[in-house]
Structure formats: structure tokens, C-alpha cells
Amino acid sequence: LLNGKKRNIYADKLAKKSLVLIKKFLKEKKYKNIENLKKLMIASFFAGEAISFSMVGLIHPFSAALSSIFRIPHCLSNCIVFRGLKSYYIKEYNFLFNCFNHQKITIENIIKINNNKIEKLYLSTMKHEKPLKNHLGKNFKKKLNYDIVYNIFKSI
């Protein structure tokens, strides 16, 4: 589930538990009832803990940038950014958006990215060195240069 150099058994267990709960939630026909929403909240907690204990992922540096620049909730910015990172997470992307389609959940693009915002988004993304280095290696700045970050944000 998790990848990166700082993975550990504790984070892996949290991630697996989160995924089990998310799958149950998304497969329910009436997912918006209070009991299912409680399960999703717990799953979200487990996922957040897994990420914080393993420092993995490209989504969160991009998502944090999007949240801070556009003042949108973290969960929504994760979903929006996920579309731009599809090539890094093909299997996970397909699973999540198949579940969304099954539930008729749409992720609206509520942001307008212009050239004035791109520089801020780039700088805000790149300051998250630990997860970027963990996911892409110590030369992450070569693998994730301005043009690549620009194209990822423009694709969402």
C-alpha cells in the first residue's frame, strides 16, 4: 500500500486497516448514512496516521500547496490533486475513481490555476522535502522540476 524509504510495519498496518474501511464504505449502496460516515472518518484517521508515520507520497505535498493557496479542505484537495498524479498512482487512481463512479461521486474542479498561482503552488509543493525525498529519492528536485510541477497542476 505504502511506498518509499521510510515505510514501516506500523504505518503499513494503519494503511491496510484504512483501506479495508474505505472499501466497505464505498461499496455500500447508502454510503451517506451516519454509521458509514463514521467508518469513513475512522478510515481517514488511520490513513493520515499511516502517512505521518511513513512520510510517503506525492499527493500530500501537492495537496498541501493546493489547500494553502486556494483555502480548500485537505480531503478535497487530495482528490483534486490525485487526478494530476494519475501516472504515479495508476492502480490506486483506478480503484478510487471506480469507487467514486459506483457511488456517483464527482470531484468538481473548483479552482482556477493561472500563471500567477503556479509559482506559489510550485514553491509550496517543493518545501515538503521529506515526503518528496522519501518518494522520489534525494535527487527529487531533478525528477520534479518546475515544468513537471506546472504540468501536474495544469492537468487538474
Describe the role of every protein-language-model region:
Residues S18, L58, S77-V81:
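Catalytic-loop motifs flanking and including active-site residues across diverse enzymes
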Residues K32-K38, R71-P73, L144-I148:
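Structural motif
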Residues I22-F25, S44-G48, F62, L66, ...:
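Buried hydrophobic packing segments
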Residues L1-S54, K141:
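Carboxylate- and glycine-rich phosphate/diphosphate-binding segment that chelates Mg2+/Mn2+
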Residues N8, D12, G48-V56, S68-C75, ...:
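Short, surface-exposed loop/turn motifs that are enriched in glycine and acidic residues
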